[in-house]
C-alpha cells in the first residue's frame, strides 16, 4: 500500500465533489438507526400498540421538590391489624417506626384502634390528636 505524503483532501481540492460521485455528493445521511418517521402513516399500528406518550409535552421534574411518602391512620391501622407491620415492644410501650418503613409523614385520615407510639418525621395536627385520644403518642424524629 502506498503511503500518502499529503491527505487525499489536498489532492481533491477543486474537484467539486471530492471523490463522492456526480449524483449524491455524500449528502445523504444513510440509515439513522432509531430515528423513525411515518408515525402518523405507515407505523401507526406500532404507535397505537407500543408508543404511549409518543406525542405531546410531558412536563418536567422540579429539582427543588422533596418527595413525601405519607400514610394515613386508616391505612396504618389496616397494616397493623393484618400483621403486615410488626409492632416492637420497648419498655412496655408498643412502638412503630414509620421512618424505617419508608414513610416520612403521618396523615389524620381515618382512625387507629391500637394504642401505639409512632416515630415519624412529620405528622398533621389531626393525626397527633387522634393517636393521643387512643392512648398513644407521636414522636417527631426528622430524617435527613
UniProtKB/Swiss-Prot annotation:
Pfam families: Ribosomal_L27A (PF00828). One of its GO terms (molecular function) is structural constituent of ribosome. It comes from the Archaea. Residues 1-14 have a biased composition (Basic residues). The keyword Glycoprotein does not apply. Keywords: Ribonucleoprotein, Ribosomal protein, RNA-binding, rRNA-binding. PROSITE patterns: RIBOSOMAL_L15. The keyword Transmembrane does not apply. Part of the 50S ribosomal subunit. HAMAP family: Ribosomal_uL15. Binds to the 23S rRNA. This is Large ribosomal subunit protein uL15. It comes from Saccharolobus solfataricus (strain ATCC 35092 / DSM 1617 / JCM 11322 / P2) (Sulfolobus solfataricus). The lineage of its organism: Archaea, Thermoproteota, Thermoprotei, Sulfolobales, Sulfolobaceae. The gene is rpl15.
